[in-house]
């Protein structure tokens, strides 16, 4: 039986993390991804960091996370993984990464996704992960690198970035050679023309080192983060590859654009649709 999970940031920005956890449990999810993008801010146009007033950024951040865990336990849902803030090329954001790992442990999560620096080599990113791994191990949390992408405005498509290909991803993992650094494959990124080389191929190449997922759909050009089965990705092929690779982790959605289509009073309906899409992938894996 495959367990299903989802990011909570897209709902939390509208109804708060507490209500998001409660409603995702009601919708039928087994778990949630503690998405910590609100821990700090980044102006992508200006390339500048800015501070946040979110509870993740305040002195009582652990109490806030502890309360989320309590709500989840009461509702029958748990945290399986988390996502640290990014981009890590920003030194101010890097200063929050240990806090993100600490929050992951407090929430009960097993894995914290920490992006590599898009434009650094495997060896350079290894040094970055080496700085975090002792802290993560002390808190009982694994770190997962993720396949990234850049954008080529001239070509009108994505372009290579750290971990974008199987070769690059494996080079990053091999540069660290620590079982506590694992792979989170972003299915949508892997399918983007110009940078990725196809999710099924990357799933098979990563094998047992693949321990987390970000699942969403796109048109194979843009990073759309839409609900599975709504655009162009072949989730039958993805499910077959996951089954072949003996993937044992959670099926975690990152379809964070989907709820934009729902008014606040209809958000729960959107959550149910997300759950149904994740359950459909789980069924495809069982049938593969």
Go through each PLM region and give its residues.
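Short, well-structured secondary-structure segments
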Residues: 30-37, 78-83, 112-113
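Short aromatic-enriched loop/helix-cap "lid" or pocket-rim segments at secondary-structure transitions
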Residues: 44-46, 155-158, 226-227, 264-265
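Glycine-rich, proline-tolerant flexible connector loops at the mouths of alpha/beta enzymes
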Residues: 33-67
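Positions that flank functional sites
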Residues: 39-40, 86-88, 118-120, 151, ...
